[in-house]
Amino acid sequence: MENFPTEYFLNTSVRLLEYIRYRDSNYTREERIENLHYAYNKAAHHFAQPRQQQMLKVDPKRLQASLQTIVGMVVYSWAKVSKECMADLSIHYTYTLVLDDSSDDPHPAMLNYFDDLQAGREQSHPWWALVNEHFPNVLRHFGPFCSLNLIRSTMDFFEGCWIEQYNFGGFPGSDDYPQFLRRMNGLGHCVGASLWPKDLFDERKNFLEITTAVAQMENWMVWVNDLMSFYKEFDDERDQISLVKNFVTCHEITLDEALEKLTQETLHSSKQMVAVFADKDPQVMDTIECFMHGYVTWHLCDARYRLHEIYEKVKDQDTEDAKKFCKFFEQAANVGAVAPSEWAYPQVAQLANVRAKDDMKEAQKPILSSIELVE
């Protein structure tokens, strides 16, 4: 295994944060904790339901970790939407993370997908059955155009996860494959469209800005995620089908060249994102900027990405990039480093156990006859 290119990663991260003029001021600490707990609490009760527990069959610790990660992402990034919208999006995106971590073959359960869809029957695939049940709670926040993007992008995501089941990084020379797969499983259109709830934006009035935001967010969001995930995925056997690794295979280039390709595309996308919306509707620009800054804060602070390890490694170094990275990291930590114990309670497993005990008590109650009830 090659050594992780720490200096290159620092330089790239610093340039990204400078390009977007990173300065997360989305919340006070109290507001952040309040929104985190609200979204988490509703989502935790959702996943503690017997139907969800039975059909998902996810390890409780993994489900808990997935939920905490997603609630952080949504609350930090969707800073302008209502708490109710945050909670419903948290549930939806937790479902996507659960699917992303799954290793089940979807083929058997997808044989009758369209027939069931057309007939209005419940889907055979348990993930689709649960996601479809929750979708109305998500879509009620959005107009028809944004809703269609959410539905379509979620379908693309499912297909992308299906492809990833084969651990296939593409054939050498298939230059379009890496970006095809990343767009498919990146949820870029779902994210881009879910920034514009109908209680804040008239999608007809802001149609051009929203359409452009969906187009731009498709790449920016996934490329930033790939860049900020590069460290945690570098030596993880489960994360070898990544955009960077697929660049190596399909473009037949070195890992350094693949990382440089991702870097240049991410930085270019960041420049575009800022420039395109600079003179547009101020509310649109504010929403996009809050998302970008919150999304970066989430990556820097969430334990899933292990970027605190980079910070600890370089905090005593005297290079310019190390100093800048540490300054940005500390800036993010000051606003976004909130211990899960402050907001992620009670745990899903605890709620599920309480529900199971309550159901058992109900089942054990004596059944009175109609005569006894009259008496």
UniProtKB/Swiss-Prot annotation:
It catalyses: (2E,6E)-farnesyl diphosphate = trichodiene + diphosphate. Belongs to the trichodiene synthase family. It is an enzyme of class 4 (lyase). Keywords: Lyase. The keyword Secreted does not apply. This is Trichodiene synthase. One of its GO terms (molecular function) is trichodiene synthase activity. It comes from the Eukaryota. Its EC number is 4.2.3.6. One of its GO terms (biological process) is sesquiterpenoid biosynthetic process. TS is a member of the terpene cyclase group of enzymes. It catalyzes the isomerization and cyclization of farnesyl pyro-phosphate to form trichodiene, the first cyclic intermediate in the biosynthetic pathway for trichothecenes. It serves to branch trichothecene biosynthesis from the isoprenoid pathway. InterPro entries: Isoprenoid_synthase_dom_sf, TRI5_ascomyc, Trichodiene_synth. Gene3D superfamilies: Farnesyl Diphosphate Synthase. Trichothecenes are sesquiterpenoid toxins that act by inhibiting protein biosynthesis. Pathway: Sesquiterpene biosynthesis; trichothecene biosynthesis.
